[in-house]
Amino acid sequence: MSRRAAVKTPRAGAAARRGAVARRTKETDVAVELRLEPGEAAISTGLPFFDHMLDQISRHGGMALTVRAKGDLQVDAHHTVEDVGIGLGEALRQALEDKAGLARYGHAVVPLDEALVEAVVDLSGRPHLTFNAKLPSGKKFIGGYDVDLTQDFLQALVNHARICVHVNVRYGRNLHHVVEAIFKATARALRAATAREGTALPSTKGTL
């Protein structure tokens, strides 16, 4: 895992539902901005397939998203993918603020041709990822993207957003379809969980 050397911008306030993070290490330079309402995506990580997946998070998550990342791709893509997950998680945590008035729970089942993926999200304040995904055997890379990094990305996102996510790949033959459905289902579950439902905090504990 990358050594952390983060510099964060101040929180923009609950009403804005915005988050922004700048994070620089010896391995990567990452900047993430998001707003929890539909908007444009501007993604550049040096990994075209990963850019495409982050665009799915923006589109299906109902969020405006900007991600700029430069990493040591000559070594491996792991640092870049993981650090983008860290930045996105921290920005999401800022945007959620105290979670008052949010649905808290979200669930989505997304098909992509022969692939079917389920994702469930709880804005619990307790980081947890269950990644139940037996990916199709054989092919491991999609356009230079190591599919194993999908779990690492989600783990970083979960840890830094402090949310609970369960992903279940029910079935699928085409690796591209399976991975894309994972991102789409997670995004749609996040969109449902972050939807507004009044003003009350969705917890009997009084905090999340």
From Swiss-Prot:
One of its GO terms (molecular function) is imidazoleglycerol-phosphate dehydratase activity. It holds the Pfam family IGPD. Signal peptide: none annotated. Gene3D superfamilies: Imidazole glycerol phosphate dehydratase, domain 1 (3.30.230.40). GO terms for cellular component: cytoplasm. Keywords: Amino-acid biosynthesis, Cytoplasm, Histidine biosynthesis, Lyase. GO terms for biological process: L-histidine biosynthetic process. SUPFAM superfamilies: Ribosomal protein S5 domain 2-like. The keyword Cytoplasm applies. Coiled coil: none annotated. It catalyses: D-erythro-1-(imidazol-4-yl)glycerol 3-phosphate = 3-(imidazol-4-yl)-2-oxopropyl phosphate + H2O. Belongs to the imidazoleglycerol-phosphate dehydratase family. PANTHER family: IMIDAZOLEGLYCEROL-PHOSPHATE DEHYDRATASE (PTHR23133:SF2), IMIDAZOLEGLYCEROL-PHOSPHATE DEHYDRATASE HIS7 (PTHR23133). This is Imidazoleglycerol-phosphate dehydratase.
